[in-house]
Amino acid sequence: MKEECIITQAEFNLVLEKQMERCASTLQKKKKEYTGDNQDRLIAFKVAAAMQGCKPERALAGMMAKHIVSLYDMCYADRETFDRATWDEKITDSLNYLFLLRAVVEEGQADG
């Protein structure tokens, strides 16, 4: 019988820590690209919502869908065809959209 590969809690914590660092770094790098000089970190979703006649949550969900579909496709494809950098990028982008959604929801609750 083949020996199972396991990940310990300590190893998982390291994975989580590294992923959070990637997320924070990417969000910081992309800030200027998506907000320009605007102080509102969520302005891109508000503008997209206004253009589409919907709430910022829905605009963000539409943008996030592309990343989730890409990640889903990778999960169902031959795993060997994707290198670690590609996995890192897709996972990080997907998580970052969820973090941004959290901020949109928080702002909406504060306004309401």
Regions found by a protein language model. Name each.
Residues 1-112:
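Intrinsically disordered, low-complexity regulatory regions
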